[in-house]
C-alpha cells in the first residue's frame, strides 16, 4: 500500500501474493464500503461507528464496558474468516499526519548535567 497523492490509496500487490490473500483483501474493502454506506444512510452513528473507531484493541474488546452503539462482534470480527485469523493491535488509530505536523518530544533531557 502507498499514498502517492494526498487522500488517496494505491494498492499494488506483488506477484508473490496468492490469489486467496487478494480475495480476502477485496472482501475487507467491500465490508468497509458497506459500513460506510450504513453511516451515509443513517443506520450507524456519524461519530461513533465501526469505521471511525476501528481498530479495537484486545483490551477494549474484552473490557466489561463497551461504550459503542455497535456490537463487539461487528467491531472485532467483521467477516467470518477474521475469527480464525484475528490479531489484535496494541493501540487504536494513530493520526500520523497530525503527529508529523505537531511534533511532541517525549525523550528525557539531552543536556549534559
Q: Which functions belong to the PLM regions below?
A:
Residues 1-113:
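Non-catalytic terminal extensions of PLP-dependent enzymes
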